[in-house]
Amino acid sequence: MTPPALTPRLLLRAYALGIFPMAESRDDPEIHWVDPRRRGIFPLDGFHISRSLARRIRRMDWTVTVNEDFAGTVRACADRDDTWINPTIFRLYVGLHALGHAHSLEVREGDALVGGVYGVTLGRAFFGESMFSRRTDASKVALAFLIDRLRAGGFTLFDTQFLTPHLASLGAIEIPRADYHRRLGEALAGKAEFAPPGYSPDPASVVQRSSQTS
């Protein structure tokens, strides 16, 4: 029996079940489905902005954009020696972006992408897929602006898939699979906006709101 074709809509169904895809490498055509025993999440009221990062954000000469170069952001995330983003995964997420279920946040120095993050939205859940940094702290700046946006839009779950030391230093935690699936079910029952009406963040307000909630 031939398995169903892997499409963006089928991918959304997998996310709703708490499963996400990965490839072993960019050259591996196979897709593996993952449901970790322990899951990384970012409590949206627990993002830690250090004093040095707060200064960087307040004084930065970078600009932050949203959904202006989704494909470029995914390519930049894959531009490393080892990556799980193969051509099939790239195609699927570009398809999700066209459906309005995948978004990018870019950090720019002039016209150049120097940092960014992308992920999938479903209900009140945001599934962070990957991020990149071509300048010191650029990915941290992207996360700060992303989390501020998720809070403003009514999101309740930020899934980081795995917990890395870098994410842990910024406030991410690890929870058991059963706890994750409970939180996911609650998030899927609601609705959130990645582009909430009237939301227009500036660097100082992002730092201020983060210090009030963390």
UniProtKB/Swiss-Prot annotation:
Keywords: Acyltransferase, Cytoplasm, Transferase
Protein location: Cytoplasm
Source domain of life: Bacteria
Reactions accelerated catalytically: N-terminal L-lysyl-[protein] + L-leucyl-tRNA(Leu) = N-terminal L-leucyl-L-lysyl-[protein] + tRNA(Leu) + H(+); N-terminal L-arginyl-[protein] + L-leucyl-tRNA(Leu) = N-terminal L-leucyl-L-arginyl-[protein] + tRNA(Leu) + H(+); L-phenylalanyl-tRNA(Phe) + an N-terminal L-alpha-aminoacyl-[protein] = an N-terminal L-phenylalanyl-L-alpha-aminoacyl-[protein] + tRNA(Phe)
Chain segments carrying region Disordered: 194-214
UniProt EC number: 2.3.2.6
Transmembrane residue ranges: none
A GO molecular-function annotation: leucyl-tRNA--protein transferase activity
Enzyme class of the recorded protein, top EC level: transferase
Gene3D superfamilies: Leucyl/phenylalanyl-tRNA-protein transferase, C-terminal domain
GO CC term (a single one): cytoplasm
Similarity comment text for this entry: Belongs to the L/F-transferase family.
Function: Functions in the N-end rule pathway of protein degradation where it conjugates Leu, Phe and, less efficiently, Met from aminoacyl-tRNAs to the N-termini of proteins containing an N-terminal arginine or lysine.
Protein name: Leucyl/phenylalanyl-tRNA--protein transferase
